[in-house]
Amino acid sequence: MKPVIALVGRPNVGKSTLFNRLTRSRDALVADMPGLTRDRHYGEGRVGERPFIAIDTGGFEPVAKEGIVAEMAKQTRQAVVEADVVIFIVDGRLGLAPQDRVIADYLRKTGRRILLAVNKAEGMKYTAVATDFYELGLGDPRAISSAHGDGVRELVDEALDLAFAERPELAEAAEGHDHGTRIAIVGRPNVGKSTLVNALIGEERVIAFDMPGTTRDAIYVDFERNGKPYTLIDTAGLRKRGKVFEAIEKFSVVKTLQSIADANVVVLLLDAQQDISDQDAHIAGFIVESGRALVIGVNKWDGLDGHARDRIKHDMERKLQFLSFANVHYISAKQRTGIGALMKSVDDAYAAAMVKLPTPKLTRVLQEAVEFQQPRRAGVSRPKLRYAHQGGSNPPIVVIHGNALSNIPETYRRFLEGRFRDAFQLKGTPLRIEFRTNKNPYAQSNE
C-alpha cells in the first residue's frame, strides 16, 4: 500500500503548485473526479524508491456553513480522514493569517500527523519565515518553495518517514498475499461490485484478512475458483460481520488507486443500464496509466432489450475506445451469468501481461512491419528501425532500436503495437513501445 499525503491550507498558499511538483515526478495519475468534487484532486508521486498518493484540496475555511466554500471545507475534511500525513501549507510572504489559526486548531483535533510547511520562502531568512508560525503549535515550520522546489524533497521524505512509522503495515500490507492472481474489481458506486464479489467468493468459503483502521485500508480476500487460487483486493468495502461478509458500496479514490496498484489484473465494472460516465472514463484512465492488465465487465445485462444493448455498446466504442486491448464481457452478477467467461479473460490477461517475448521473434515482427509500411520521413532522414527486444513485463514493454526515431508519429506507433499484439496474441494487457536511438550491432554494416 502507498502512504497518503493530504495538502491542506487556506486559498492561494500554493497547494496546487506543490501538488503538481509532487505528481510530476513520475507519470502522474491525476483525478479530477466528476461526481465527487472539482476541489479534491488525487495523484501519484514518487520520491526515490518510495511511491505515495497525494491529495490536493481546495482552500480550507473550516467555519464555513454554506455554499461552495462549505463544500470545499467538507472535501478537505474528507481528505484529512483519508490521509496518513497532512502537510499544512501557509504563506511565508503574507505571514500568519487568522484563518491559519483556525485551520491549525482543527488539525490538532484530528489526531493526524501534521507537518507545517511555510511556502514562498525563497530568498527569506529562516528566522524571519519561522517566527510567526511557531505560535500555531504544530512543531518546527519547514521553509519551502513549491514553485522552485526548495525544501520539497526533505519535506516529503519526512512525511513518508512519519507515515511508515505510524503504520508499519503500509510496507507489509501486500506481503503474504501471493495466494494467487491478485484481482481488483473497480467501478463507480452502485454498478454491482459487491454483488460480483459475492458471486466470486461465496460468503462461506472466504478466508479474509481485515486490517484494523479506516476506509483507506485495503482488504485481501483469498479464494479459489475451479481449483485456481486468487486474491481479491477489495474496493467495494467488504467488512466482516460475524461469519458473514457484508459488501458496502462505497467509492474511494484512494482505495481505487491502491487496489489498481496492488493488482495483477483489474476488472472494470460498468452499469449496462446507465450511459458511460466521465467517472467511468477517469477510472479507466487510472488503469491504463498504471499499466495493469484489464478485463471489462458490463453488469446488469440481463434486464436490457436489444435497443438498449446496442446503445451501451455504441457508447463504449465512443467513450472507451482507448480500452480496445481489453476483452469485454456482458454479465449479470446477480444471476451469476457470464462470470466464468470473465474469469477466463482474467487468466488470459494476466498471462499476456507476464509473457516472455523472444528477441529474434520481436525483431522479425518489426522487420515484417517495416517492409509492409515504412515510417514517414521526418526532416532530412527517414527513421530506421533496426531491432527490438523486451524491456519489461506487467505490462510488456517492447524496446525498438534504430536511427532518427525521435519523430516517429503516434499513428505509426499504434500500427507497430497492432502488429506485435497480433503476433504474440496480447489481449487484455497494455503494451508499451519505447524507441531508442543508440549504438547497436547493425549500425556500421547497414549505414
Curated annotation (Swiss-Prot):
* InterPro entries the record matches: AAA+_ATPase (IPR003593), G_ENGA (IPR031166), GTP-bd (IPR006073), GTPase_Der (IPR016484), KH_dom-like (IPR032859), KH_dom-like_a/b (IPR015946), P-loop_NTPase (IPR027417), Small_GTP-bd (IPR005225)
Name the Gene3D superfamilies on file.
3.30.300.20, P-loop containing nucleotide triphosphate hydrolases (3.40.50.300)
EngA-type G domain residues: 3-167, 181-354
This chain belongs to the protein called GTPase Der
Q: Which family does it belong to?
A: Belongs to the TRAFAC class TrmE-Era-EngA-EngB-Septin-like GTPase superfamily. EngA (Der) GTPase family.
**Protein's organism:** Ralstonia nicotianae (strain ATCC BAA-1114 / GMI1000) (Ralstonia solanacearum)
Q: Where does GTP 1 bind?
A: 9-16, 56-60, 119-122
Cite a single GO MF annotation: GTP binding
- Quaternary arrangement and interactors, per the entry? Associates with the 50S ribosomal subunit.
UniProt keyword terms in alphabetical order: GTP-binding, Nucleotide-binding, Repeat, Ribosome biogenesis
Q: Name one GO biological process term.
A: ribosome biogenesis
Q: Do you know which PROSITE patterns this protein is assigned to?
A: G_ENGA
